[in-house]
Swiss-Prot record:
The gene is tilS. SUPFAM superfamilies: Adenine nucleotide alpha hydrolases-like. GO terms for biological process: tRNA modification. Belongs to the tRNA(Ile)-lysidine synthase family. Keywords: ATP-binding, Cytoplasm, Ligase, Nucleotide-binding, tRNA processing. PANTHER family: TRNA(ILE)-LYSIDINE SYNTHASE-RELATED, TRNA(ILE)-LYSIDINE SYNTHETASE. It comes from the Bacteria. Pfam families: ATP_bind_3. This is tRNA(Ile)-lysidine synthase.
Length: 398
């Protein structure tokens, strides 16, 4: 585990989180993690997708207790049908991140194994992915406020099951893991040993290429791009290319994924426009280039104003005293009292900044500089909290 570190001390206030479904792989992870350190906490997610899921989740919590592993049950709210596996995965990680933060976990261990890696790479190979996709699942990545660590990526699932059998530890078999309606299940059942070996070669070659490309991109962004704490970016004309636009659009939007390549190429041909909730426009007084700002129409809805609340998936409100019933939403027309030229903030970017509203009136604006709000409103501390980097997501993957 040392190579995945650094790790916090093994104390009550800094446990390491475990994502445990109750299946063989995650139960093996829990067993091994508990042998590694005393302070771990398992999070068991009930997706509520099957009638028996609640009972299975409770059984898993009981089994973890028998392994001397502290466990918390997380039950997801119902979500719309369609793209069920994708929606369930997204909702699961949202719940896991929030649970980790509440328990003081900086790291969450996830039980992806060698077979998962093979299937992921082969699936992306079939869909003609480039180095970004073919580099596969990374052993360490960052999601929001936590690290996701996958220490079992080089271990076959058969070895994990043998570990459980040797310790007389039971697990749950999820019937959806055998449902051939899902592409991943078909690959899991149909991939030959030769194809799995080819997938591993593809993954290693793509990983090296991805690292090289990311290093080049980071150098180019360092030379031509400027990130501003108000959530917008200036990109000099010499730095405008497909890769730079793609990662910067993702950065400004806070999206988990880059926009589609074809859409980025179309945007480059136009020279300006909107994509993935981001406006790309000429920089004007800010220099020779373009600026990228959040698209106002794409902003998230108001959320209750409380310490730690995240609005639009990007801005987190720190501790502050607000009236009961206050909400976090965009500044919008409230920016009329601001001297945007003096503050150096584009009009479109300022409208999309967060503020605290109460009964239709802005009571707290973001802290932008001396006398930004005058007597119009107080100030609140918002921090950028999307957890989406421009580059470097894969710097743990060597």
């Amino acid at each position: 585990m040392a190579r995945f570190g650094p790790w916090p001390p093994d104390i009550d206030d800094a446990p390491v989180g475990l994502a445990v479904s109750g299946g063989a792989d995650s139960m093996a992870l829990a067993f091994l993690a508990r042998r590694w350190r005393r302070n771990v906490v398992a999070f068991v997610v009930d997706h509520a997708l099957r009638p028996e899921s609640a009972a299975e989740a409770q059984l898993t919590v009981h089994r973890l207790a028998g392994m001397n592993v502290k466990a918390r049950l997380l039950t997801l709210a119902p979500f719309p049908k369609g793209r069920m596996q994708e929606r369930a995965r997204h909702a699961r990680f949202e719940a896991l991140e929030a649970a980790c933060v509440s328990e003081g976990c900086l790291d969450l261990l996830v039980a992806h194994h060698a077979g998962d890696q093979d299937e992921t790479v082969w699936m992306r190979h079939l869909h003609a992915s480039g180095p970004l996709g073919l580099s596969g699942i990374q052993p360490v990545s960052v999601r929001g406020r936590i690290r996701l660590v996958r220490p079992l990526l080089t271990f076959p699932t058969a070895r994990l099951r043998l570990t459980l059998q040797a310790e007389n530890l039971p697990w749950i078999e999820d019937p959806s893991n055998a449902n051939r309606r899902f592409e991943r299940v078909r690959l899991r059942q149909d991939l030959t040993p030769e194809q799995r070996q080819e997938a591993r070669v593809l993954q290693q070659d793509a990983l090296q290429e991805r690292l090289r490309l990311e290093a080049e991109l980071a150098e180019e962004l360092g030379r031509h791009a400027v990130w501003y704490s108000q959530g917008w970016v200036f990109l000099g004309q010499e730095g405008v290319d497909e890769e730079a636009l793609s990662v910067l659009i993702r950065l400004v939007s806070g999206s988990a994924y880059r926009p589609a390549r074809e859409a980025v190429r179309t945007l480059m041909t136009q020279g300006y426009g909107t994509l993935s909730g981001v406006q790309v426009r000429p920089a004007g007084r800010f220099g020779n280039g373009i600026i990228l700002v959040r698209e106002e129409r794409a902003l998230g809805p108001f959320v209750p104003a409380k310490a730690g609340a995240v609005w639009d998936g990007r801005w987190r409100l720190l501790a502050c005293d607000v009236p009961q019933g206050s909400l976090i939403g965009s500044l919008g027309d409230a920016i009329h009292v601001m001297d945007l030229r003096r503050l150096g903030v584009p009009y479109a970017a300022a409208r999309c900044l967060p503020g605290v509203w109460h009964e239709g009136r802005l009571v707290l604006g973001p802290r932008l500089g001396e006398r930004a709000w005058g007597e119009f409103a107080g100030e609140a501390d918002f921090v950028w909290s999307s957890g989406v980097p421009a580059t470097g997501e894969n710097h743990f993957g060597t």
